[in-house]
Amino acid sequence: MATQQVDSRRQVAAEQVAAQLLERRRGSHCDDEKQTLLALLILVLYLSTEIWGSSWEVSERIRECNYYQNLAVPQGLEYQTNEPSEEPIKTIRNWLKEKLHVFSEKLEEEVQQLEQLAWDLELWLDALLGEPHQEEHCSTYKSHLWEWAWALGREHKGGEGLLEISLSGAEL
């Protein structure tokens, strides 16, 4: 009978935690929009920093190209054209390609990490809410679920149940 009371307390506590998480999930639509806008702002700032952050290097290369052309002028080898020199354009193009390639690789890694975290969170919430999930993603999910189940099974003093369990104990 005592185990039934403990089990019912745990079930009630689990339902309360699940309801709180679900309510946070529903009520955070505005927060999600704010976080999305903040992420976009950070992305734009990061892009502008990556593209223009080392622009002094490009400017220095352009000055070097112009310097060598200007050295030829006093020697009577005057070279004038209305078209811009191809060398600085190639330098800038190569620099931009390089920076954009590095940025796209970093961005792809970040997106993959975020997708993995979202997947883990979804599985964790499904397990918490008792919803069946057809496929298990990987062994880390099983180990995290085991940690979470172990945390549920611990005895808590004062009869508080799950409310004392921090989410860090059931890491995602």
Swiss-Prot record:
GO CC, alphabetical: plasma membrane
InterPro entries: DUF4635 (IPR027880)
Subcellular location: Cell membrane
Keyword S-adenosyl-L-methionine: no
UniProt topological domain (Cytoplasmic) ranges: 1-36
Residue intervals passing through the bilayer: 37-53
Membrane topology category: Single-pass type II membrane protein
UniProt keywords, alphabetically: Cell membrane, Coiled coil, Membrane, Signal-anchor, Transmembrane, Transmembrane helix
Coiled coil location: 96-128
Extracellular side: 54-172
A Pfam family annotated for this UniProt entry: DUF4635
Protein's recorded name: Small integral membrane protein 23
